[in-house]
Curated annotation (Swiss-Prot):
EC number: 3.4.22.-
InterPro entries linked: Metacaspase
Gene source species: Plasmodium falciparum (isolate 3D7)
Name assigned to this protein: Metacaspase-2
Cellular compartment(s): Cytoplasm
Gene Ontology MF: a single term: peptidase activity
Family per record: Belongs to the peptidase C14B family.
């Protein structure tokens, strides 16, 4: 659990304060605070008074002092443990986590030993006595290093001389020369002295100035740490040989190994006692309080150079410029040996700021500038001595083992700690002998007191700036305040002005700081790195030192650097070689010879090891960060690189300043720009609000973070925050290390990797060619450009990088680099992840005043993308820029790098691009990540070749290479659409709200190209909502929906192409006269190639020209028409070649049958191609409209074609469009000709216009009002011409217009090129689709066809009036009733009746083929049938229809039948039946239903192959009909519950709440669940309630406030009908409400959208609504939230036992809970809770009593069995308290919904609720293992009428289940496996069998359990009671088992438990069944102990008991009997 300030407005102040106190308690062991001094504001910010901070500080000081006293007086350490002091820093409120020490502190050598020695004037005799040494006789050697080395019996003084000669320029072997204390050449100083104008200035708090001897320091600081040290030499002697280095190394090693440790321990203890007694202000004896000074050097010119040695000591060399220079080892006593912090521990860092001074020699000819070198506190891991028993041994592994859960990621912006460095410097200069305020210097650091006091938030909030970004994004107003108060982070020193101010660079807190100064002997380095120290994986970093530009000004510069992952030791050195000596530095393997001119006083010119050259990812000797290079004429200087500047997207470490004095001004300017840029970002990161009385915590919203699929949750996917703005001059820009480089054609493909948890550092490979380009790039413009584009410091730090050492190859480096992050969820090697992050700014005319901001709701914007919503610049948005500049500035220099154009603080707003000139509404959400981040390589393959130039060109022409662009042209828009869009515009302009676009939700596997491009994008393509689906267009131009094809990358669309095609077709028609006839032939190649443009234009040409064909060839065409085989006839006769062996006619009706639909589409395309010529012949038959032939044979052929074409169209085309297009063209081409010509015209239209148009989903809705041969064709772009006007009847004047009913389009299916049609298929066609194998049916169809042919002699065409559709346009499969009509017997029965004819459309009540007067009802509700005929005596009927149409204004008042697929025979209302009785005398033939609900739609889902299940039941119904000859249709088809239940519709209520992005996964969960419901289970009625404007397909969303949720739920439950399947889904937050008055009475609640007003949805409110569910309804509820208890009236629940692979039933006891409230575990990182912490609310209404649903007593004794509702409730188990969101495959998902969805995908079609629950639970187990989850378990609750294993999931099977007999508990039964639905219905519904069941005797097993004897007491607790439970399980059956306390609890007596009880088990099948006997331990929760499994055939005996690990622990003795 991370110690984060999880404060939220959703919490109460009390909860927030408790969280704060808990976190502080966790961070600081001794933290205590008073609640009275802490408060919380309304936004969740914690306010702590300063007095409280001061009090805590004083308390902690006292505690630290007392702990030190205890440490000193610990007797147990007196002899065995050395007196290393434990250095604990002051844990104040200021420092908190930044300086909180790890408990694992390694005790270091006391650094105060020098003073102790000096005070007592230790001589050599004392040392000899103490160390038992006999060979140190020379008194003069007491201060010599050799004397201490002689402790190890080293008699050879030459060893020491050799060691000293390394630094001795004069090669002086005289040891006595080292002892000259006057020159202070061998005195080591605690802290560096700065000699300014001959005056001493000390960083000394206590003014202690003691010399330190080299002998003491060598021993105390090096010899006992097993750390070889390196010697620095200011003036290197070229004649140093290898022997000296080797001898010194051997000496050092030997000294350590042979030194007596115990003596040193005793010595150190005496030192501590002395030192502590002399301190006036004794404070923990910390090294931070000790500062020693040194005597002034006699030499005037001293050069002090610091170097970083592995021993954590600074070497200060006092060099005399005279010839007599004594170079000796000078080690500062400053640090001594300190505690060690491991890199993986959290809050362990040191901040010690010291300075040293390097003065310029008087005779320096190069005019070197004075260099001010900062030195840093350093820590190393001390290697334990060989005597492990007597030492305090703590290694890195031990540290990591003790606290493995501590977060290893810790970062902060150290620049906050150095803001007032200049003020401190003034204190030092002006008051050198006065005490420095301890508040200013704390632990060697320099702080601002106010800032420290204000910094009260913990380390996590400070370090993880991403949380600040989120907070700033959500609460941008506070950011404005913070920006006003931000502090300056850097003070740039100018040479002439402000000389007293200091240059402060941001400092990263890292583990080990190595200050290298003047270490030039590579042999030493080599020997050091090859020493055994490299065995420990300790991270090291180097400090880059900066130049001082003025010798008289003391200017400090602080470097910023990273800790690299330790592979092998590495020291990066700063060569500070005097110009006079002409020395060369030989790097280890590089052998880079740099002249002195290139090296003098350039602290940031680093001579790197060869490993840098070996790694392309690390900068080779060239500074790649050329933004910081100040180029001069010295090319060699450019070769110097920053030692810290490894390729890291987050690092802007140092600035290379070369030694030319001319460049110093450039350096100053560059540093200024760095300061300005860094100031912005750092201030944003650690923004503090000062207040006199309170300190404001940065409020962190609960549960906000980002899932990046393998990356840290606190890092963005790619951070291009530091990318500079650079124009793209027709060249591709590559961003390496976030620095823009022009592509010189040598740039390789840049591969980026996920490097660390804290930040995604782009480690890019690069060629040396790039470096060569920049070497020679000395252009002034380039230099200025670089200065102005300094890469800013990234907020996040990286603690997990790799420093590549000497002998590593590039490949090894890459392998080492990818240390798997902790949060790498996907487990994929980051090396394989290609991350491309290109932000494409598309909009060039953004109007910010309208708040048109782009936002995609499918992707809640990750917080790391947002720095500050108010800091957006024009560079980022490209406001008011030219089109050419847009793409040249796609990536700007802004801090933000979001994958969308603009991020506005108004989350609910959506960006809308400006419309094209001809577009009314253009909504485009462009996928900004053209090459999205690839986390799952299998699911997404990127197109890496993105050509920005081409993209730019396409964008200019509005031809976006993006499939989610929808154009709606002005010409095509109808009135309703305009009204809708105007309403949207009003909302946008007045309320700044834009209706969001639909979320693209289907990943269609059939469309490969689409999946390649948009599989795992953050922003799925968006489509418009219902308003833009309802589009009515007559296709004059290419339909707007086909813009998808034109914009598709596969289709190269030229805007002028359509005009060319149009002209091509129009020019073929020479005459434009109305009566002209033309020959027209289609283009075979165009149709063959499926050229969309040509086909659409062909349709247009036909429509525009009202094409008539030449009648000169009429006779020939007539003859050819007789012998032409139409494709539809081939389909009907099944003559065409079909590879499908089953001869199954593939239907394009089914949505779910994807393969069949695509196959049918492709087959149809082939048929169209093969029969193209035949179709052309069919087109020419239109000339027969003027040549009418009365030949009966001709008529038969015509009508044959008519029938077949109708069938063909109904199979392959959209029925709506067929009718409208057919009728439309029919009227256009009809000028009062006879009916046969109309038939021919319909045939041509079917083949040539509608089918082709519908095949390409060119769905166009024409509003048709049909009455007395009247058709009103209303479009905005085409009016009825003169010919059409002639076709209108006189009754047009009496016809009233009805409202336009738009056609809904499935946009998703259009894009995937799937052919979908509406549900109103004819009965005959349903038979073809589903029962093609029935040969008898084909015979019936043929008979029916011949009878229809006879009706062609009729003379008039009666038009059909369309009924208002009440159902969805989505296609569902055939219903239960339609199969009855399709049955062969039923069809034969209907066809044989003379007066009762049912047409091929199921909605036609009847039509008469004979000359009867009163039964002339003609196709009242048919919208698909093309030609219906009546006799001459039909005028009365026609008049009746006119009366109905005139009198009944209500569209529902007319006689019509529902148009949905599954309700085809259960018809509307009794009023319709009465209308039919009064007007048409056909009441006997009206199919009706007794409807309770307002919606008459009924749906059912069956497979194409599942209809056979109902066949036998249909046969039974038919047999009864044969007996009753005179039964009417209504009686025959009225389905009572006894015979076969009514099959209702399926409805879903989906509630989604993401609380402005707090729960990202809810949107994904809802979309995924809707996909399953619609595609798999046939749901077509969705009610969407959400707070994020989520639209699914054409279903419009509503706000998810409390009122809407409760009202919709009430209507959802109450208005349902018997047989309905209801699905209720909720995903969001739940909360526990606790009444302060009644602490024991608590209640759970859901948080709606308006929860801020305390509008909670209480559990009893949901409970009481669901309790109203009655009748034969099935309700499935899924609550994907944490608190789900008592929301649903289901008394029985199931949980899954993974050990048994079975499920366990438990029941609630009157819904009373005795469980204690357990606070859910808050987790951050991989998962996140879906609940809010409990809150206390006053005056909560006491929950109503929960009453379990009880069936009302029914006294009716009829045969109808009352159906009882079945309720199934999926939810997290409240006992395990948690429900989570988690990230998987780069998407955030809810745990429960994801597991259920995956289980649905894995299971077959037939699975029960119990099967689904078991599968989901098993998936959960795998997820829990992967994500290390514990407290998660699912629960399935259900009503006790039926078992979840009885009912199939979301099927109508529950309707056939009858009430079960009450069996004695326990209720055990096997799972009922059905062979087919019909068999199951017969078994359950048969009355005779039911009677037999009542009289039958029960079979049961009596199991007599005697005793259990144990073999072992290993897992047996004799204090607890035990009981035995038994159940029966059949093989291969996943049963529902109920475990009960079937025996009484018994205790163990000796080694046995005696039960002597019977257990009764009810059984149905005795064969192949196993009995499970299990032993449980009785506690608050029963614990499984062991089980025994044996076959049911066994009668008695003893059986072994085995535990979970299958270890036998005892034997159970029992007997079994079977009774009945």
């Amino acid at each position: 659990m991370n110690s984060m300030n999880t404060y939220s407005p959703l919490y109460s102040s009390y909860e927030n304060i408790n969280i704060y106190k808990k976190n502080r308690k966790f961070e600081e062991d001794n933290y205590e605070t008073s609640t009275a001094n802490i408060s919380c504001d309304s936004k969740g910010r914690i306010l702590v008074k300063e007095s409280e901070n001061d009090r805590n500080e004083s308390i902690q000081k006292k505690q630290m002092l007392s702990s030190m006293d205890n440490r000193k007086t610990n007797k147990s350490e007196k002899h065995n443990i050395s007196s290393y002091y434990k250095m604990r820093k002051k844990a104040s409120n200021h420092l908190k986590d930044k300086e909180k020490l790890n408990n694992n502190i390694i005790y270091a050598k006391n650094p105060h030993a020098n003073r102790y020695d000096k005070y007592y004037s230790l001589n050599m005799n004392i040392m000899n006595n103490m160390n038992n040494m006999n060979n140190m006789n020379n008194v003069n050697n007491m201060n010599n290093v050799n004397n201490m080395n002689n402790v190890n019996n080293m008699n050879n003084m030459n060893n020491v001389n050799n060691m000293n000669n390394m630094n001795n320029v004069n090669n002086m072997n005289n040891v006595k020369s080292m002892y000259n204390n006057n020159n202070n050449s061998n005195v080591y100083y605690r802290i560096s002295r700065q000699n300014i104008n001959g005056k001493e200035r000390l960083l000394n708090r206590y003014n202690i100035m003691r010399p330190q001897r080299s002998a003491d320091m060598l021993i105390r600081n090096y010899l006992y740490n097993d750390l070889p040290y390196e010697i620095n030499q200011q003036n290197l002697n070229k004649n140093i040989n290898d022997n000296n280095a080797g001898s010194f190394d051997n000496l050092n090693k030997t000294v350590f190994e042979n030194y007596n440790k115990n003596i040193l321990d005793e010595y150190n203890r005496n030192i501590m006692q002395y030192y502590n007694s002399n301190l006036k202000n004794y404070r923990n004896s910390s090294f931070d309080n000790i500062y020693t000074r040194y005597n002034n050097n006699n030499n005037n010119n001293n050069v002090y150079s610091n170097n970083n040695v592995y021993s954590n000591n600074n070497i200060y060399n006092n060099n005399n410029n005279n010839d007599n220079i004594n170079n000796s080892f000078q080690f500062s006593k400053q640090e001594g040996l300190m505690k060690i912090y491991s890199n993986n521990n959290r809050n362990m860092n040191d901040y010690v700021v010291k300075t040293s001074n390097i003065t310029r020699a008087a005779d320096n000819t190069c005019a070197q500038e004075q260099i001010n070198i900062p030195t840093y506190n350093k820590t190393v891991l001390l290697k334990s001595s060989p005597n492990t028993e007597n030492t305090f041994n703590k290694t890195l592994s031990n540290i990591l083992k003790e606290q493995p859960k501590r977060s290893s990621m810790f970062s902060f912006n150290s620049s906050d700690f150095f803001k007032d460095f200049g003020k401190l410097r003034k204190n030092f200069v002006g008051k050198k002998k006065n005490k420095i305020n301890k508040d200013i210097v704390i632990n060697g650091n320099i702080f601002n007191n106010k800032i420290i006091d204000n910094n009260t938030s913990n380390a996590k909030s400070e370090g993880n700036s991403t949380l600040h970004k989120i907070y700033n994004f959500i609460f941008p107003s506070s950011v404005k305040k913070l920006q006003k108060k931000k502090q300056k982070l850097q003070v740039i020193e100018d040479k002439e002005k402000n000389s007293n101010r200091a240059v402060v660079m941001p400092l990263k807190n890292k583990i080990i700081y190595i200050n290298d100064a003047n270490i030039t002997n590579d042999k030493f380095k080599h020997s050091f790195e090859n020493y055994n120290y490299h065995q420990t994986n300790i991270p090291f970093v180097s400090v880059t030192n900066y130049m001082n530009k003025d010798s008289t000004k003391n200017v400090r510069s602080f470097s910023s650097f990273d800790v690299k992952e330790r592979i092998s030791p590495r020291v990066i050195r700063n060569g500070n070689i005097n110009n006079n000596k002409n020395n060369n530095i030989n790097n280890n393997n590089n052998n880079i010879n740099n002249n002195n001119n290139n090296i003098n006083n350039n602290n940031n010119n680093i001579n790197n090891n060869n490993n840098i050259n070996n790694n392309n990812n690390i900068n080779n000797n060239n500074n790649i960060n050329n933004n910081n290079n100040i180029n001069n004429n010295n090319i060699n200087n450019i070769n110097n690189i920053n030692n810290d500047f490894v390729n890291d997207s987050n690092i802007n470490k140092t600035v290379n300043i070369h030694n030319n004095n001319n460049n110093l001004n450039n350096y100053s300017n560059t540093m200024k720009s760095v300061a300005k840029n860094t100031q912005k970002l750092s201030a944003q990161k650690n923004s503090l609000v000062n207040d006199k009385h309170h300190t404001y915590h940065e409020k962190l919203i609960t549960n906000i973070y980002q899932f990046t699929g393998g990356q840290s949750q606190k890092s963005c996917n790619i951070k291009n925050q530091n990318v500079k703005e650079e124009k793209i001059n027709n060249t591709q820009i590559s961003y390496i290390n976030n620095t823009a480089y022009n592509d010189y054609t040598n740039l390789p493909n840049v591969e980026t990797y996920v490097l660390s948890e804290k930040s995604n550092n782009l480690e890019n490979k690069e060629d040396n060619n790039i470096n060569e380009k920049f070497k020679n790039d000395n252009n002034v413009d380039k230099k200025n450009n670089d200065e102005n584009n300094i890469i800013k410091h990234n907020v996040n730090q990286n603690n997990n990088e790799v420093i590549v050492m000497n002998n590593q190859t590039e490949e090894q480096i890459n392998d080492n680099k990818f240390i798997k992050p902790l949060n790498n969820i996907t487990g994929i090697d980051p090396k394989k992840k290609n991350i491309y992050n290109t932000v494409m700014h598309i909009n060039d005319k953004m109007d910010l005043n309208k708040h048109d901001y782009n936002y995609n709701y499918n992707n809640i914007i990750p917080h790391n993308y947002i720095n500050s919503s108010d800091k957006m610049t024009n560079n980022s948005l490209h406001i008011n820029k030219k089109a050419d500049d847009i793409f040249q500035n796609m990536i700007s220099n802004n801090d933000t790098n979001v994958p969308c154009v603009y991020v506005n603080k108004y989350i609910n707003n959506i960006f809308q691009n400006n419309n094209p000139s001809n577009v009314t509404n253009y909504i485009n959400t462009i996928n900004m990540n053209k090459a999205p981040i690839t986390i799952d390589e299998n699911s997404n393959k990127l197109d890496n070749n993105i050509n920005y130039e081409n993209v730019t060109k396409n964008m200019i022409y509005n031809n976006y290479t993006n499939n989610n662009v929808l154009y709606i042209t002005k010409e095509k828009s109808d009135n309703k659409l305009n009204n809708s869009t105007n309403h949207l515009n009003d909302l946008k302009n007045n309320y700044y709200v834009i209706n969001p676009s639909l979320l693209y939700i289907h990943n269609n596997n059939n469309n490969i190209e689409w999946n390649k491009q948009y599989t795992n994008n953050f922003s799925k393509p968006n489509f418009l909502d219902k308003f833009f689906y309802e589009k009515k267009v007559e296709s004059i131009q290419p339909h707007h929906l086909n813009q998808y094809y034109y914009n598709n990358q596969n289709v190269k669309y030229n805007p002028s192409h359509i005009n060319i095609l149009e002209n091509k077709y129009v020019n073929q028609f020479t005459n434009q006269n109305e009566n002209s006839l033309y020959n027209f032939t289609t283009h075979h190649n165009n149709i063959k190639n499926n050229n969309i443009d040509n086909i659409l234009l062909l349709d247009k040409a036909i429509r525009n020209q009202s094409i008539y064909y030449n009648n000169n060839k009429g006779d020939d065409e007539t003859k050819s028409a007789e012998h032409t085989t139409n494709p539809s006839i081939n389909l009907l006769k099944n003559n065409y070649e079909d590879k499908n062996k089953s001869n199954y006619v593939h239907s394009i009706v089914s949505i779910t049958d994807k393969d069949n639909s695509i196959y049918a589409k492709n087959k149809y395309a082939e048929v169209v191609t093969k029969n193209n010529e035949k179709r052309e012949d069919a087109i020419h038959k239109k000339d027969e409209q003027y040549i009418f032939n009365n030949n009966d044979n001709n008529n038969d052929n015509i009508h044959n074609n008519n029938i077949h074409n109708n069938i063909h169209n109904n199979i392959h085309n959209n029925i709506h469009n067929n009718i409208h297009n057919n009728i439309h063209n029919n009227i256009h081409n009809n000028i009062h000709n006879n009916i046969h010509n109309n038939i021919h015209n319909n045939i041509h239209n079917n083949i040539d216009v509608s089918s082709r148009e519908n095949f390409f989903q060119h769905d166009i809705q024409n509003t048709n009002q049909i009455n007395n041969k009247t058709i009103l064709d209303i479009t905005q772009n085409e009016k009825p011409n003169a010919t059409n006007e002639k076709c209108l009847d006189i009754n047009n004047k009496e016809k009233k217009k009805k409202k336009i009913k738009s056609v809904h389009y499935d946009m998703d299916e259009i894009l995937s090129l799937k052919c979908k049609v509406y549900d109103e298929l004819d009965t005959c066609l349903k038979c073809i689709n589903n029962l093609t194998k029935n040969k008898k049916l084909y015979e019936q169809l043929k008979k029916y066809k011949h009878k229809l042919d006879k009706d062609t002699k009729t003379k008039k065409l009666y038009d059909e009036c369309t009924s208002e559709k009440t159902g969805s346009y989505y296609t569902m499969k055939d219903s239960y009733i339609s199969s009855l009509l399709c049955n062969e017997y039923k069809l034969n029965h209907i066809l044989n009746k003379s007066n009762n004819k049912v047409s091929d459309d199921k909605h036609i009540l009847s039509y008469n083929h004979h000359h009867n007067k009163n039964n002339n009802i003609n196709d009242i509700n048919n919208i698909k049938h093309i030609s219906k005929f009546v006799n001459k005596d039909n005028e009365k009927t026609l008049n009746n229809i006119n009366i109905l149409n005139h009198n009944n204004k209500d569209p529902n008042s007319g006689v019509f039948l529902p148009s949905d697929n599954t309700e085809s025979v259960i018809y509307n209302m009794n009023r319709n039946r009465k209308l039919c009785d009064n007007n048409f005398n056909v009441s006997k033939h009206v199919l009706y239903k007794d409807s309770k609900g307002t919606d008459s739609t009924r749906t059912n889902f069956y497979d194409d192959y599942s209809m056979s299940y109902v066949k036998s039941n249909v046969d039974n119904v038919e047999k009864k009909e044969k007996i009753k000859n005179n039964i009417n249709i209504s009686d025959k088809y009225f389905l009572s519950e006894t015979d076969s239940p009514y099959i209702g519709k399926k409805k879903a209520l989906m509630i989604t709440l993401n609380y402005n992005g707090l729960l990202e996964g809810c949107v994904n969960d809802t979309v995924d669940m809707c996909d399953h419901l619609m595609q798999r289970f046939g749901f077509n009625d969705f009610i969407l309630l959400n707070d994020c404007n989520l639209c699914y397909r054409n279903f419009v969303t509503q706000k998810a406030n409390k009122k809407n949720i409760l009202s919709n739920l009430h209507n959802f439950i109450v208005n349902s009908n018997n047989g309905d399947i209801l699905f209720f889904y909720f995903c969001g937050y739940s909360i526990k409400l606790i009444d302060s008055k009644f602490t024991e009475n608590y209640n759970f609640a859901l948080l709606p959208q308006d929860h801020s007003k305390n509008n909670y949805i209480y559990s009893n409110e949901i409970f009481n609504i669901i309790k109203k569910l009655q009748g034969g309804k099935q309700l499935c509820i899924i609550f994907d939230t944490t608190y789900t208890s008592y929301f649903v009236p289901v008394p029985t629940s199931i949980t899954y036992n993974k050990n048994m692979n079975t499920t366990e039933i438990y029941k609630y006891n009157n819904f009373s809970s005795n469980q204690k409230y357990l606070k859910s575990l808050k987790t951050f990182g991989k998962i996140r809770d879906r609940n809010v912490d409990s809150i206390f609310v006053e005056n909560i209404k006491k929950p109503l009593l929960y009453e379990i649903y009880k069936k009302e007593n029914d006294t009716n004794t009829n045969d109808k069995i009352i159906l009882v509702p079945s309720i199934f409730f999926f939810s997290p188990d409240c006992n395990d308290r948690n429900d989570f969101e988690f990230s998987i495959k780069n998407k955030v998902r809810g745990l429960l919904t994801y597991c259920l969805g995956k289980a649905i995908e894995l299971l077959k079609n037939d699975f029960s609720y119990h099967d689904l629950f078991v599968a989901a639970s098993q998936i959960l187990i795998d997820i829990k293992k992967e994500y290390n989850l514990k407290y998660v378990k699912f629960k399935l609750s259900f009503l006790n009428e039926y078992s979840p294993d009885d009912i199939k999931f979301l099927s109508h099977e529950s309707l056939f289940l009858k009430k079960k007999l009450q069996l004695d508990e326990p209720l055990w039964k096997p799972s009922l496996k059905l062979n087919n639905l019909n068999q199951y219905i017969q078994d359950i519904c048969n009355m005779d069998e039911r009677k037999m069941l009542k009289s039958s005797k029960k079979k049961c097993l009596l199991i007599f359990i005697k005793d259990i004897k144990f073999y072992t007491y290993k897992n047996i607790d004799t204090k607890n009671e035990y009981f035995v439970s038994c159940f029966i399980k059949n093989k291969n059956v996943n049963i529902l088992c109920v475990r009960r306390n079937n025996t009484k609890e018994q205790r163990i007596v000796q080694d046995k438990i005696f039960f002597l009880e019977y257990i009764t088990l009810n059984v149905t099948h005795m064969e192949n069944a196993n009995i499970y006997v299990e032993l449980f331990k009785k506690k608050k929760k029963n614990y499984f102990v062991a089980r025994s499994i044996f076959n049911i055939r066994n009668v008695n005996g003893k059986f072994s008991l085995s535990d979970e690990k299958k270890n036998i622990i005892g034997i159970i003795d029992l007997n079994i009997k079977c009774v009945s």
